[in-house]
Amino acid sequence: MHHFTLFSLRRLSYALMYFRRPPWDTGISPPELMEHIAGHSAGRALDLGCGTGTNALTLARHGWQVTGVDFIPAAIQQARRKAGAAGLPVDFRLDDVTRLDGISGPFDLALDMGCFHSLDRTGRPAYLNNLERLLAPGGTFLLYAFLQAGNEAGKRGLTEAEIMAIANRLDLVNRVNSTERGRIPSAWLTWRKAAA
């Protein structure tokens, strides 16, 4: 019951942010994604926690076949409207990234800009199981996440131990540490699933 209540409050908190423009919804895709697009042939992409679809639409404009997933109805509605207005065939789904039962891979790219680091610790193993199931052999997982120094329950961000745990499943290809808004430690992490 405690998990359900915490999950419900978290969902409500995110849903309320979509009555205005959430601070993370800049409408601009980051250079790290643009660099990936420039260096790889278009394929299938999965945008985990896609919000209003900015990055999914960027991928689609560059020829990618994209599925975007978010658990906030208002975000998915906005994403679908934006895709319709742009004439882009993006499959936006209202779903929970810890479930994803109706989504089939394989995907050549999985993109996550701030979704995984917001999950509570109990949802992270299911997320990673889905990621591993849906990512194609040789596929890339491009992750932007806040970092945290300790292992404080309920605090957003990944610990070094969690990053190492992901490294037991996927190969860490690149890591660039930075700070968000000049004060929050963060990183871009590029992972690759071993080729079959």
Regions found by a protein language model. Name each.
Residues 1-46, 52-105, 119-134, 139-196:
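Class I (Rossmann-like) S-adenosyl-L-methionine-dependent methyltransferase catalytic domain
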Residues 108:
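Residue-level marker of regulatory loop/turn positions in helix-turn-helix DNA-binding domains and
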